[in-house]
Every structure is written in structure tokens, then in C-alpha cells.
Amino acid sequence: MTRWILAFFLLTGMARAEVNTEILLASKPPRTLAAFGFFEDPSTLRPSKGVVRYDITAPLFSDYAEKDRFIYTPEVLDPDTDGILPFPIGSALIKTFRYGTRKVETRILIHKDTGWVGYPYLWNEDGTEATLKLAGANLRLNTSFGMIEYRVPNFNQCGGCHTNAHGKITPIGPRPRHLAKKGQLEHLVQAGVITHVPDVIPTPDYRDNNLPLERRARSYLEANCAHCHAQGLPADTSGLYLNLEEDRPLHLGVHKKPVAAGRGSGGLLVDIDPGRPEKSILYFRMNSLDPGVMMPELGRSTLDQEGLDLIAAYIRSLDPKK
């Protein structure tokens, strides 16, 4: 009889699965993604109570994988600034990478009392269960974009992108301006994630051909490069700052000589040679799959042809005399 009552509650929406906060904050991660309780049904990614789907305007290129993003926070967030949302301890960001219906991996960032920590989970071929894979994995996937040598990052590689000015792991995407798309901030208020809609200028969607070329290109560089290439972040010493707030042409790479020569420069002289993408180190490194040359260093094993075309057009549009 009890089973029938429970089934009735589940079918009518009167009872929903909840996140297991004890497992979430444990010192060691569980073997399976399902143990966290983020999803009522992991195979369909149907979120549990308190887990909210979201998206960002300008996503990082990840070998053409689609991404399903979710937020879990035990408290309503007050987005007073346009920095990263002030996630309390016990919060989690969940991101699943997939090609069509084929789920490949889910990455989790959890805010524990010791700071943020990231864990990679690898899905089985049936898409019914994801298992902890601290060592990462190399997969050969047959996708609609062709064969892709997909790399699941290992536990230590999370910090390769998710590192702040203090050397600590931190989220990247959930800033109000990255979330400001198609009423999403209003939805996050209604869902109890944030207290109000902050007054921010939305990050441009670099995929929108109706926007000015420069805005699209700057947004692309922000999404794919600025997690390292910004003042105070891991690539600070390069002097190449590609975040949207940067407005100094030299720090944006225009006529800027590289700090360090070597294979990464390809024998070229400046990061951006206005009017000539083929003479620009920035374009050269984006157009490479050589591990000692390519940028970004992590997160891709294929070329982003649409991104390359966008940055090439942007460089051609720059005035060589300025």
C-alpha cells in the first residue's frame, strides 16, 4: 500500500526527489552522479527539487558538444554586482556535455567549506548512469560533426580554467550579464535562485549575425579566452587581456609583441596584426591543434571553424593605421 501512495505522489508531482546535502558536502565524492540527487531521473536529466536549469549567452566552445546546465543553491542569492553570483557553501553547478541524445560527461563544481572543488563523471553508452572518473578519459566519438577525439578532464585539470586571481577554483559562467537572455533572470527570480533582476548590460551572443562584428568577436574572446587572459588571472604575465571590460588596444593584442617567443608565436611578430589574421599570433594559435601551440590549451581537440571565421573577420576589420 505504501508503494502505491508513493507512486501516486510522484506521478502527481506532490513529492519530488531532493538533493542529498550530506553527500554533497562529504569529503569524498560518491561513485555515481545519481547519489547526489540532482536529478529525479538521471537518464533524462529531469531536475530534482531546488535544481534549476539555466543557460548563458556566450558559451565556451567544447568540440561542438551541447551543454545542459543546472544550479543548486541552498539559499536565495543576492546579485548585487556583476561578479560571479555569491554562492553559499552547499551550492553546486552541474553541466552535462552531450551530442544529440548521447550524454558524454557531467562536470560538477561544489562549494564546500574548504572552497570550490570539481568532479568529472563519465556516462555509460546507454546514458543511464554516470560514474566518477577522477583520472579523466579520452574518447573517440562518432558525431554529426565527424569523429571527435573527446577529452574528459581529470580532477586536477579543473583548475586549468576555473582559477581566480587568488589561485582558488571558482565558477566562470554564472555572472548576471552572462545570464541576461530571453527573460532568464526573471525566471531565476521566480525559481528562487536570485532575489531580483540586476541592472546589467547583457553579454552579446557571438552567434547572432545581426550584432556588430566587433561586439560578437569580443564576446567570443571573453567566453573562450578571458578565464585566463585577464588582468590578475593565470595568463596575466602575457599582457594579453581579452575580457569584455578591457578597452586598451595594446592589451587587446593590437600591434602587441608576445612576451615569450617560441613555437607558440609561429614566427609571427604581434598578437593581432590589424587587417591580417594570417599574420596574427592570436589567430595562429586558435587555428592549431598542436598541444604546444593551441589556444585554449584545454577543452577542445577540434577547430572551431565558425569561431575562426569570426575572429578572422574581426581582425580584417581593424584599421592597420591605428
Where are these regions (language model features)?
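N-terminal pre-domain segments of enzymes
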Residues: 18-70
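Sec-dependent signal peptide recognition
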Residues: 1-7
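Hydrophobic h-region of N-terminal signal peptides that target proteins for export
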Residues: 8-17
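Flexible, active-site-adjacent loop/turn segments at secondary-structure boundaries
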Residues: 31, 36, 59, 68-69, ...
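Short conserved catalytic/interaction loops centered on acidic-Pro-aromatic/His motifs
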Residues: 169-175, 230-241
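Extended surface/linker regions that mediate inter-domain or inter-protein docking
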Residues: 60, 66-219
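The −1 position to Zn-ligating cysteines in a subset of zinc-ribbon hairpins
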Residues: 157, 224, 294
